Amino acid sequence: MRGFDKLDLESLPTPAYVVSLDLLEQNLNKLDDVQKRSGAEILLALKGFSAYSAFPLVRKYLRGTTSSGINEALLAREYFGGEIHVYNPAFTQSEISQLAEFAHTIVFNSQAQLDKFADFARSCAKA
């Protein structure tokens, strides 16, 4: 398997996630090229890739993360840094209170949720 020629895959405990940092960096270079040529900012979706041991490499190329809830957002804050964007279909007031302290963007699921939490989130962020 390309990128793993020096690794005895049969000796690894299972289940296990194995990441080739060389191949990951090749992909990150492609994403960086897209960012530079388009002006877009690409975020790491933690739902799809939350291997925090690779975050030091990934954060060299990507501006921040997108999280689908409080736990992923806390992971981003502790291990990734950068911009933290959060979406959740049903935030609680406690989650909004925490997220307002560090999240750069909170995306609400509906107008009703925005109406319910927007003023509270703003007040938490200013505190």
Feature locations, PLM:
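Generic N-terminal amphipathic, Lys/Arg-enriched alpha-helix
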Residues: 1-18
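Short, well-ordered helical secondary-structure segments
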Residues: 6, 11, 31-36, 58, ...
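Broad hydrophobic/π-residue packing in well-ordered secondary structure
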Residues: 16-19, 34, 42-44, 64
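Generic, ordered loop/turn and secondary-structure boundary motif
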Residues: 13, 18-19, 50, 92
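Active-site-proximal beta-alpha core segment in soluble small-molecule metabolic enzymes
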Residues: 40-127
